[in-house]
């Protein structure tokens, strides 16, 4: 796997500048979260590098690699189906910073909403999500994700 890591913001953002880069990162997250919420395990895992690390407090240890990411999505789907709920993730207050090595460092709030069949939605969790994004073949991929929950802080 070859990962592109330009050193300058101009190389990352292109002629349109940081605003265009920011919009592309928002679009990446919108796509990634919709894959996750629709339980498209393979599609979601493909938005991560092959050797990605995914750390969330609901798991005993970080997930490493795409096969583990696929298994995590399938496990979440079973839990939601058994519980009769649909979960939706909303990403906001996104901060994007560039590293000297061309890696994007992002930090945002992730709100998880749960909706029971036939019931009202409720806010299930408030989290902070911190990622390292790298480019591979012109597309952004998550290399590392750490999620923390406000209720466990």
Please tell me what each predicted stretch does.
Residues 2-13, 79-153:
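A beta-strand edge to alpha-helix "cap/lid" segment located at domain peripheries
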């Amino acid at each position: 796997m070859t990962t592109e890591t330009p050193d300058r913001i101009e190389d990352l953002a292109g002629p349109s500048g940081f605003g265009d880069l920011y919009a592309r990162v928002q679009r990446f997250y919108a796509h990634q979260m919709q894959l996750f919420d629709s339980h498209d395990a393979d599609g979601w895992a493909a938005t991560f590098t092959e050797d990605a690390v995914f750390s969330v407090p609901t798991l005993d240890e970080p997930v490493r690699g795409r096969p583990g990411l696929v298994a995590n999505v399938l496990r979440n789907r079973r839990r939601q189906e058994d519980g009769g709920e649909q979960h939706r993730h909303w990403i906001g207050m996104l901060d994007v910073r560039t590293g000297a090595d061309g890696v994007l460092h992002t930090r945002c709030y992730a709100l998880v909403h749960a909706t029971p069949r036939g019931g009202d939605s409720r806010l299930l969790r408030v989290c902070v999500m911190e990622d390292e994004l790298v480019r591979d073949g012109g597309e952004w991929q998550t290399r590392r994700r750490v999620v923390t929950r406000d209720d466990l802080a």
